[in-house]
Amino acid sequence: GPMGIMGPRGPPGASGAPGPQGFQGPPGEPGEPGQTGPAGARGPPGPPGKAGEDGHPGKPGRSGERGVVGPQGARGFPGTPGIPGFKGIRGHNGIDGIKGQPGAPGVKGEPGAPGARGIPGERGRVGAPGPAGARGSDGSVGPVGPAGPIGSAGPPGFPGAPGPKGEIGPVGSPGASGPAGPRGEVGIPGVSGPVGPPGNGAAGIPGVAGAPGIPGPRGIPGPVGAAGATGARGIVGEPGPAGSKAGPQGIPGPSGEEGKRGSTGEIGPAGPPGPPGIRGSPGSRGIPGADGRAGVMGIPGSRGATGPAGVRGFPGSPGNIGPAGKEGPVGIPGIDGRPGPTGPAGARNIGFPGPKGPTGDNGDKGHAGIAGARGAPGPDGNNGAQGPPQGGKGEQGPAGPPGFQGIPGPAGTAGEAGKPGERGIPGEFGIPGPAGPRGERGPPGESGAAGPTGPIGNRGPSGPAGPDGNKGEPGVVGAPGTAGPSGPSGIPGERGAAGIPGPKGEKGEPGIRRDGARGAPGAVGAPGPAGANGDRGEAGPAGPAGPAGPRGSPGERGEVGPAGPNGFAGPAGAAGQPGAKGERGTRGDGGPPGATGFPGAAGRTGPPGPSGISGPPGPPGPAGKEGIRGPRGDQGPVGRSGETGASGPPGFAGEKTPGPQGIIGAPGFIGIPGSRGERGIPGVAGSVGEPGPIGIAGPPGARGPPGAVGNPGVNGAPGEAGRDGNPGSDGPPGRGHKGERGYPGAGAPGPQGPVGPTGKHGNRGEPGPAGVVGPTGAVGPRGPSGPQGIRGDKGEPGDKGPRGIPGIKGHNGIQGIPGIAGHHGDQGAPGSVGPAGPRGPAGPSGPVGKDGRTGHPGAVGPAGIRGSQGPAGPPGPPGPPGPPGPS
């Protein structure tokens, strides 16, 4: 019929989810190039939006499972979003629609539910400890950055040979106790693994687009022209304003487990004895003095120079993993920020399709089934008589007893390839279902490979040129706006006329049966193309059971009749007994490749397979960037008291005065970290996300080739009588009885007609009761390999399997060749003097000193040298008056 009048243009809809990967259609005839319209004027900048308030930080979630790389579909043309209708039956994935105009930015959503905790990796071997670097100055604690992706564990390093015994350095004066270091988590030793892929950072908030220019007068839509030549690529637009700043800082993670105390260091050697002192003469015993007061703690001495490294000790016993810390309290849920103003509609730009992605790996070959016993060849059936054009529905017979399993017959010779069937009339469109609830945000998937290049669409008529506007200043980054309302659905187009059916092929001669050897089980074929939905017939009343008739020979294929009206679903019969296995038919030649099918629905995830054999270790990746310093940990335990030094020469007994408090000895060397503990219990899987919005159903696919005729099944039991359906609409006039068999035509196939618009969908019938389970059909010949299917969504993780049997303990490895002694590093710069440490505990009381003996009287020393004459002193004060003289 003629094309209907185009309705008014609805408001722009929200951006839909990317559709599945489309298949490349046949190239259209080149049309005349369209006229290039002048560029529109750039509108003035929009008002800046208000930034929303930041919500409270949520509870940190566990690391989610690594998503599977999904196939990236070709970027289709934007479709016009329709009004959500009732939920219809799930249709086939259709061709990508026209891309709609981008909607206004949405409001910032709540943080998603925490993802499921990943399964811990395999236990790595302990790598050789690296050389100790010079102690750097304590820097200020930086802000906690976002956690980067966890890199894969690197290959285990070989244990290094013990180094040469270092020289014993002089015992330095004890330095001041430094501040307690940050409490670190127990790290997994090993060689650094390759750098993981860069994390997908969250996209910045899109800037507010400028206000649209004054629209020109609306032109009358012209007829759709033929596909024009590919136009030149447009000029790249100016980059948008920068995104908003990063989100608020996350809650710091729980503190790591307390580190193990290092082993005590070796006792240093005794110092050389001093020169003997001059024995003094015994002095007189003095009066015992009063008890002195506690001495004042002296200023800590400067830190001694670092001595050479000592001999490496034996590795310590493997540490035990401490119990898991308690889960922190749930954070206060964040408050949704105020929605910003609705931004204007962006420009309608159609991107170019991406390059074709790589082909996925083939799946594992299934196990071969048990070969069945060889069956006797069955007799050939008689050809059935020509039946009427359309027979009435027979009465349903009772269910027969289960048959015995037949013996497979010999393989016959391959028959001639049949002519390709005629193309069926496409079915009518289904009513789009209502939009489902909004799903929770799932874990981010990895970037998919680029899909194949799609065909170039028809070029639309160019619009009138708008007035040139002044160039506006760049706008301020606005807050995300709310999504605009969905636009009204377009008027469905009229149904196109059916194509002219091609000539019918001649019937091939039956093949000669020969006894052949049983072939090996074939590989699992790819799924064939999906057939179109057949027409529904009206439900007839259930009749009494009739006897099973003899098997007739397959009749000739009739011409495709016109599509009848949509019927209502009839009642389904009760479940029948499983039928006997039929004879294996002869394998025919491969037919022509079928039409490209649409991707099937995603299958359910199977149970986890057995662990594969570990591959060889890959080459070490480049060194990662220096990580951000973590928060300062809790103060460690007080170190052990130093070992008692070697006894010096006996001194003279002193007075019994209490000495000052001793300084805590320096902590011992840190022991070698133990081996990694056993694998922890996997975390609880996160909640399943809500289903995403239902996409627009695509047009039905082309009808697939007819399948192989199966053995007739056992008659099922009569089902319950269905309800009377509504009377169907009048169908098109019939074509009469089948004519005589004509000679094959010699004309060339006509040009392919244009695809007609989608017809209206009929009313959906009420669902009938469950159908009868039919007998197992015979295995047909293997069809041609279908196109590469689109990889389905990753299923949810399965339940945890039972714990495996402990493996056999491996043999002790051969000791490696001692490595070459490394160069002695330069002496590190002395570290800065740390603050005074806490006062140590009181040391044990020393032994009670004995009373000293009286010393010898000292010898008379030599006469001293007379000193030089000093300067004259100041004049003294005047003396008192003298006595009076004699008169």
Curated annotation (Swiss-Prot):
Tissues expressed in: Forms the fibrils of tendon, ligaments and bones. In bones, the fibrils are mineralized with calcium hydroxyapatite.
What is the native source organism of this protein?
Hippopotamus amphibius
GO BP: any one term: extracellular matrix organization
Entry's PANTHER family?
A: COL_CUTICLE_N DOMAIN-CONTAINING PROTEIN-RELATED, COLLAGEN ALPHA
Q: Does the keyword Transferase apply?
A: no
Q: How is it modified after translation?
A: Prolines at the third position of the tripeptide repeating unit (G-X-Y) are hydroxylated in some or all of the chains.
Stretches with biased composition (Pro residues): 872-887
* Biased composition regions of type Basic and acidic residues, renumbered to the chain: 51-65, 504-517, 791-802
Q: Does the keyword Secreted apply?
A: yes
Q: Which gene encodes it?
A: COL1A2
Say which family it is in. Answer: Belongs to the fibrillar collagen family.
- Please give the superkingdom of this protein's source: Eukaryota
| Gene Ontology MF term list | extracellular matrix structural constituent conferring tensile strength
For region Disordered, the annotated ranges are 1-887
**Pfam families associated with the record:** Collagen
The residue ranges flagged as biased composition, category Low complexity, are 1-42, 126-155, 170-194, 221-236, 278-290, 368-388, 444-455, 473-503, 518-533, 560-580, 595-605, 658-673, 690-720, 766-782
Please name the InterPro entries in this protein's record. Answer: Collagen (IPR008160), Collagen_superfamily (IPR050149)
Recorded protein name is Collagen alpha-2(I) chain
Keywords in UniProt for this one? Calcium, Collagen, Extracellular matrix, Hydroxylation, Repeat, Secreted
Which Gene Ontology terms of cellular component type are present?
A: collagen trimer; extracellular matrix; extracellular space
* Record's subunit section: Trimers of one alpha 2(I) and two alpha 1(I) chains. Interacts (via C-terminus) with TMEM131 (via PapD-L domain); the interaction is direct and is involved in assembly and TRAPPIII ER-to-Golgi transport complex-dependent secretion of collagen.
Q: What exactly does this protein do? A: Type I collagen is a member of group I collagen (fibrillar forming collagen).
Q: Where in the cell is it found?
A: Secreted; Secreted, Extracellular space; Secreted, Extracellular space, Extracellular matrix
